[in-house]
Swiss-Prot record:
NCBIfam families xref list: PRK05751.1-4 (NF004393), secB (TIGR00809)
Assigned protein family: Belongs to the SecB family.
One record GO biological process: protein tetramerization
Organism: Aeromonas hydrophila subsp. hydrophila (strain ATCC 7966 / DSM 30187 / BCRC 13018 / CCUG 14551 / JCM 1027 / KCTC 2358 / NCIMB 9240 / NCTC 8049)
Places the protein is found: Cytoplasm
Protein origin, superkingdom: Bacteria
Pfam families linked to this entry: SecB (PF02556)
Record keyword Transport present: yes
Protein name in the entry: Protein-export protein SecB
Gene responsible for this protein: secB
Amino acid sequence: MAEEINNQEVQPEFHIQRVYTKDVSFEAPNTPHIFQKEWQPDVKLDMDTKTNILADSVYEVVLTLTVTCKLETETAFLCEVQQAGIFTIGNLPEPQLAHCLAAFCPNILFPYAREAVSNLVSKGSFPQLNLAPVNFDALFAQHMAQAQAQQATAEA
């Protein structure tokens, strides 16, 4: 019986324990006069992810979206959302675990964060803001390539 257990492959484990809003901020510093201007915004999106180890195989992933909208030189609004999730991830080798935490989990969190940003902007009486989907897999691959290039440069 013990040999049967040892011969079985250990299966990867992935569970979403919880998805929640960790922090929200919305500022419209130049209202109400900004509403009188022609709406030709310059919208800038910054993203960041952070991972915290909560317990063995339990991780908190926090996706931060910061949206800055300007009309010419004036800030129309600044919106920041931290969307978080607690994930159980077990039996994954390090390269796949890193990919899961940096790409797969943010892919799960992004629609929630995008909805929160859209709701805040609408409640601020600004035109609806629909953020485009993000390819976190491509961002992860780009980050890994940059890290390898920096390591190669440091070793040379």
